[in-house]
Every structure is written in C-alpha cells, then in structure tokens.
C-alpha cells in the first residue's frame, strides 16, 4: 500500500460537484501517458461519493490529500473576493474538527466522521489535507464549468507540492 493517497471525491453527474474525481482521473491519465511523474509511494483513487466506505482506503496512510468541491460562506474568508467559483482552498483535518457542524460540502462532514472512525479503530491516518474547489454549478451534467475547469492545473500543482512536502519525489 502506498503511504500517500490522493483521493478525489464527488459526483461527476453533477458538474462541478465531481471536480475531485475529474482531477484524479486527469492525473491518472497523465501518469499513464508519462506526462505526469509521481513517486512510487503515491496512489490515486477515485473515491466517488463513498464516504464511510473509504475507511479501508485511507487507513494507515502517512498522508491523505483529498480533492473535493467545497462551499464556504464569503464571511468565513479573510478575503471574501477570492471565494468565487474556481477558488481553491486548503484545509486540514484539524480545520474540519473545528468546523464539524459547518457545512463545507456534502462530503466534508462524512470525511470528518470517517477520519474519526479510523482513529477509533486504531487505523490512524497521518496528515490529512483537503484541497477544496468552490463550484459554480451543481446542475446535472458531466462537464465542469469553465471557472472550475480553469482551476484544475492549479490543483494538480498543489497536489504535487503536498506530495513533495513530505519528502516524496518522482522516481
């Protein structure tokens, strides 16, 4: 099992709601083509909307990087002007714990519960980072909005930075 997990979460049938899955699919495609080099110790997983079913997937990892759509109230940001569609926000598991009653997204509370359960079962996860992308639309459809699609390269760069921050480098 790879010690670093990149987990895309979301429902690809609801446009921007599926951004996490779209990004993991993009990274997987690029890695297969050789245009994206990842360390051997990194696993890319499409988590869909599985929630607590991901317990075994995240258990025992040194670092878990979750990519998901997030909705954050503008007043919760130091700079509300930067919270528009396509904005990328970084959260930690500790941030989720402090906001466990807040509704960051449809998945973040489930993620918090899954992480808590992993700890209770002795399957602790090391560092958890959530890269959240603010959606423009959650309408039915398969394509990302232009604003969210434009954020994809930035999110991939941030994922790569998170990977190298723990000392893992492409082989």
What do the predicted segments below correspond to?
Residues 1-120, 124, 130-133, 142-153, ...:
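N-terminal catalytic or cofactor-binding beta/alpha core of small enzyme domains
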Residues 135-137:
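A short, acidic, flexible beta-alpha connecting loop/helix-capping segment that sits on the rim
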């Amino acid at each position: 099992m790879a010690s670093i997990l990149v987990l895309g979460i979301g429902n690809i049938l609801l446009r921007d709601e599926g951004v996490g899955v779209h990004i993991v699919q993009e990274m997987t495609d690029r890695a297969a083509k050789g245009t994206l080099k990842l360390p051997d110790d990194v696993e890319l997983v499409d988590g869909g909307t599985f929630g607590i079913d991901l317990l075994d997937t995240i258990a025992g990892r040194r670092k878990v990087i979750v990519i998901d759509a997030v909705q954050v109230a503008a007043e919760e940001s130091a700079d509300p002007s930067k919270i528009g569609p396509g904005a990328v926000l970084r959260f930690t598991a500790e941030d989720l714990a402090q906001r466990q009653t807040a509704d960051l997204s449809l998945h973040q509370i489930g993620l918090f519960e899954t992480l808590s359960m992993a700890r209770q079962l002795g399957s602790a996860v090391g560092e958890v980072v959530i890269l959240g992308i603010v959606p423009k639309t959650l309408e039915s459809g398969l394509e990302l909005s232009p604003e969210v699609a434009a954020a994809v390269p930035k999110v991939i760069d941030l994922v790569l930075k998170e990977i190298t921050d723990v000392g893992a480098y492409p082989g």
